[in-house]
Amino acid sequence: MPDPSFFTDEPQLTPLLRKLRSITRLSARDEQAILRLPAHPRVFTAGQDLVSEGDRSTQCWLVLMGWVQRYKLLSGGRRQISAFHVAGDMADLPSLHLPVMDHSLGAVTYVMAASIPHEALRELLERHPDLNAPFWRDTLVDAAIFREWVANVGRRPAYQRLAHLFCELYLKQAAVGLAQDHRCPMPVTQVDLADATGLTSVHINRTLRDLRRDKLIDLRSKTLVIHDWTRLVEAAEFDPTYLQLDRTLAA
């Protein structure tokens, strides 16, 4: 079900502004231009795809509420999750130039997302050339996150791998006002965490138990509580540089 706090008097595309403000500066004129983009909201239930691998896309999806996963399905139904997207993320911005999807975007939770036509985005960037840099920067940050996930899955041990993911997801949400005081939504299952980290769900369960034992985190009722941020960062060897956030958020 939708979070009642979503229904405010704010313009529909405010989450996108929050996301872009977290990684760059925007002029008032450019912000107003973004808010005027045509956007068509749609609701997705958990497990439903916003767009599937092989689809030819004519629009970008902006997450307004809920969690979306980027994933690929392999033979035998095996799944690899390569990103979690939250409110403010334009999860498939590269489709503006690469319209045939090489992955799928699926709803992890109840999701409200807005489709923004490619043509409208192209027109925005032509009329407001200063906005090319913020959107390009957003794409580059997305690529940096993907590189970090490759390192996470490929080289970090399980304990460090999961700790690193929790650090990232907390800061991503804090940057757009969805988390504070080292507490944030974490509406994923142990199977989701396994598919995002390349571990088994049994290994995830054991690693979560170890993180709790060490009094670093607690995860229950779809909420992550970080008991000791400094020690969690140390355990993960987490360097937030790749997120390119305001430094006060990463402290």
What feature does the model see in each segment?
Residues 65, 119-120, 191, 230:
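Alpha-helix/helix-capping structural signal
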Residues 83-148:
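Cyclic-nucleotide recognition modules
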Residues 48-110:
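Cyclic nucleotide-binding regulatory domains
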Residues 171-251:
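Phosphate-/nucleic-acid-contacting segments
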Residues 41, 84, 115, 187, ...:
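Short aromatic/basic micro-patch
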Residues 1-46, 90, 95-97:
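Cyclic nucleotide-binding regulatory module and flanking cytosolic helices
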